[in-house]
Swiss-Prot record:
It comes from the Bacteria. The keyword rRNA processing does not apply. Keywords: Antiviral defense, Cytoplasm. Component of antiviral defense system Druantia type I, composed of DruA, DruB, DruC, DruD and DruE. Expression of Druantia in E.coli (strain MG1655) confers resistance to phage lambda, SECphi18, SECphi27 and T4. GO terms for biological process: defense response to virus. This is Druantia protein DruD. Its main location: cytoplasm. Disruption phenotype: When this gene is missing the Druantia system does not confer resistance to SECphi27 in E.coli. Disulfide bonds: none annotated. GO terms for cellular component: cytoplasm.
């Protein structure tokens, strides 16, 4: 065998071809780290003496991936932030997606193979073995943390989930879930203490001080007040600018989900503009999603925002093929999806 040196750019091209990955820069790096983690976990979990798969520690996984990829990304051990996640962050996100199983004590196992249906043709493949071990005829495309395959190769061989089933949002829908939360919380109302003058109420997507409310009659609002640099959330009955009765909402995740319902109810839903170009979809998110829906953001990756932009605003990139799953999560919350690529072609 003849060995020859190649440039870093050439090596990245070869890696992109091997992974069947059409992205460069951060898309390629995350694809490479993800597939390398799958490969190392598969390799290290096989025992020569036992039939069952063995657990592998986080340290062993991340160290092996770092050694393999440091020639291409010399600073890979030092990278770890929201825009450029490190090896351990990517490993944890694979567990959130269901691609691997995280056990107590920092141990890992391969997840049973399963797929999530995108449309009538493609699916996202989770769990199982690395792509290099797939049988002949199964073509996997690396797309960031995930792999895309034709749905027909999964039929009859692995369990196929619908997008909403995988997302795991309340099956009854956000309207019914929120209505039940509201009625249950209101039934536990108690008289409000006198020291709640800093309460703000959520009205049509904005937090308003009680003195700014235009209605004097009794009305129920989602409320919050800052306590020790954190917000405390509650439902409040307000009359003539005064909080009369209230009941706490303990889960901030419930509050996020409820806000989307209230926006839809008040006819001011959050609108997301999707810009599609060269097979990539970009969006700007101005609010945090509930925990279950948040995992769809891991189907893509982050981009830097603009200078002096609010820290709560995030920018996301997705392979265009994955958009139906992302859209399903957003529309389940009542978010209005505006496809700017489609709009331009309709003009």
């Amino acid at each position: 065998m003849e060995w020859r040196a190649v440039s870093r750019d050439k090596a990245l091209d070869m890696l992109s071809t091997a992974l069947n990955c059409r992205f460069d820069d951060e898309g390629l790096r995350i694809s490479a780290v993800s597939e390398c983690l799958r490969s190392v976990l598969y390799q290290y979990s096989i025992s020569e003496t036992e039939e069952a798969r063995q657990t592998v520690t986080s340290l062993r996984l991340t160290s092996a991936v770092r050694r393999k990829l440091v020639p291409l990304w010399p600073d890979i051990a030092d990278i770890d932030n929201a825009i450029h996640p490190g090896i351990m962050s990517i490993l944890n996100s694979l567990a959130e997606l269901g691609d691997m199983i995280k056990l107590e004590g920092g141990n890992w196992l391969t997840a049973p193979p399963h797929a999530v249906r995108i449309d009538n043709k493609m699916a996202v493949f989770f769990g199982g073995e690395p792509s290099c071990t797939f049988s002949t005829g199964v073509v996997a495309k690396s797309a960031g943390r995930v792999r895309l395959v034709e749905e027909k190769v999964c039929t009859g061989s692995v369990e196929i989930w619908d997008a909403n089933e995988w997302i795991g949002a309340p099956a009854e829908g956000n309207e019914e879930w929120s209505s039940r939360l509201l009625s249950g919380t209101i039934s536990g109302f108690i008289d409000a203490p006198s020291n709640m003058s800093e309460t703000t109420a959520y009205v049509r997507g904005k937090w308003l001080h009680l003195s700014e409310l235009s209605f004097n009659k009794k009305q129920i609002y989602l409320c919050r007040m800052s306590v020790d640099n954190h917000f405390s959330y509650y439902l409040g009955e307000i009359e003539a600018g005064r909080l009369c009765r209230m009941n706490s909402l303990e889960s901030s995740d419930d509050v996020r989900r409820l806000r989307f319902f209230l926006d839809t109810k008040d006819n001011c839903p959050l609108k997301i503009r999707i810009k599609i170009s060269n097979g990539l979809a970009r969006l700007r998110l101005t609010r945090r999603l509930p925990r279950r829906e948040t995992k769809v953001l891991l189907l893509g990756w982050r981009e830097s925002g603009f200078e002096n932009e609010h820290s709560g605003i995030t920018h996301h990139v997705f392979p265009e093929e994955i958009l139906p799953i992302v859209r399903s999560a957003f529309e389940g919350l009542g978010i209005i999806w505006i496809n700017e690529f489609t709009r331009r072609n309709e003009i």
